[in-house]
Amino acid sequence: MEQYTANSNSSTEQIVVQAGQIQQQQQGGVTAVQLQTEAQVASASGQQVQTLQVVQGQPLMVQVSGGQLITSTGQPIMVQAVPGGQGQTIMQVPVSGTQGLQQIQLVPPGQIQIQGGQAVQVQGQQGQTQQIIIQQPQTAVTAGQTQTQQQIAVQGQQVAQTAEGQTIVYQPVNADGTILQQGMITIPAASLAGAQIVQTGANTNTTSSGQGTVTVTLPVAGNVVNSGGMVMMVPGAGSVPAIQRIPLPGAEMLEEEPLYVNAKQYHRILKRRQARAKLEAEGKIPKERRKYLHESRHRHAMARKRGEGGRFFSPKEKDSPHMQDPNQADEEAMTQIIRVS
């Protein structure tokens, strides 16, 4: 392994990665430094040392095998390659304002774990490059209290950020090497304020930890979209959406309302419904209504001739010649033609 060293004025950041050449690329104000094989310099301790220089005020991107690491710092970064157990690559990043180092371990399957902070597990296909974005903690003063936030994003995976600055990470993980993929969404409890309903699938497990986060495990893969405080699952290729947020039904959705009535009629209908429900509960009237009240009246109504829209003719309209049924007039005309012929 090789050791890459760069000194900084105030603090020193240490990241353990694999050796490589130094290539700088300018992409949207971010300096990309790729480590590959290059000329080496021997230090006094006998180790091989190389220096990485970065322009002040620009973040540094160090490409690691299988992923990329971005830190928002303008100081030169010290990269040291140290062999880990079982062929692992260990990366240690000190966080300003806190004590200790954040250690990121890259194992061959692609799992990434941050000790003392958030944990991210990445399972990607072979040949695909995963990108890990780690920003320095941003200190925000709210109501006299200092809060430290850190955003971790994985390119190629699914990440969403809430309006409060919290990060929702969707982590697809293979289960026992099978084709079935399960995803885990970590949602801060602060972003779940208000009356909300989370509709999940049959195999969805929802747990709540003591750290103020809610974890939802899904049996499918998809994208997490955060729009206006709403959490949705956008289906990917060949997948079915498993989680969505639906509004709570109001009082008007629980009871069917009659249409096209005024306020007086509406209140009267409600009173009749309450009175009928009370009588049905007491057993005084049957719960099922008959189709018609009197059979004789029903037969008479069915035998009566109706006009347009099912309206009954009045006796005067029925006797008038211009209100005669057109079908009956056609039948009489055909009868006259037959008689003449």
Curated annotation (Swiss-Prot):
Subunit text: Heterotrimeric transcription factor composed of three components, NF-YA, NF-YB and NF-YC. NF-YB and NF-YC must interact and dimerize for NF-YA association and DNA binding. Interacts with SP1; the interaction is inhibited by glycosylation of SP1. Interacts (via N-terminus) with ZHX2 (via homeobox domain). Interacts with ZFX3. Interacts with ZHX1.
A Pfam short name: CBFB_NFYA
An annotated GO BP: regulation of transcription by RNA polymerase II
Family, as annotated: Belongs to the NFYA/HAP2 subunit family.
Protein name, as recorded: Nuclear transcription factor Y subunit alpha
Keyword Transcription regulation among record annotations: yes
Keywords: Activator, Biological rhythms, DNA-binding, Nucleus, Phosphoprotein, Transcription, Transcription regulation
Disordered as annotated region, ranges: 294-341
Role according to the record: Component of the sequence-specific heterotrimeric transcription factor (NF-Y) which specifically recognizes a 5'-CCAAT-3' box motif found in the promoters of its target genes. NF-Y can function as both an activator and a repressor, depending on its interacting cofactors. NF-YA positively regulates the transcription of the core clock component BMAL1.
Major location category of this protein: nucleus
Domain of life: Eukaryota
GO cellular component: CCAAT-binding factor complex; nucleoplasm; nucleus; protein-DNA complex; RNA polymerase II transcription regulator complex
Modified residues (Phosphoserine): 320
GO molecular function, one term: DNA-binding transcription activator activity, RNA polymerase II-specific
Biased composition (Basic residues): 294-304
Residue ranges of DNA binding: 290-315
Motif Subunit association domain (SAD) boundaries: 260-283
Record localization: Nucleus
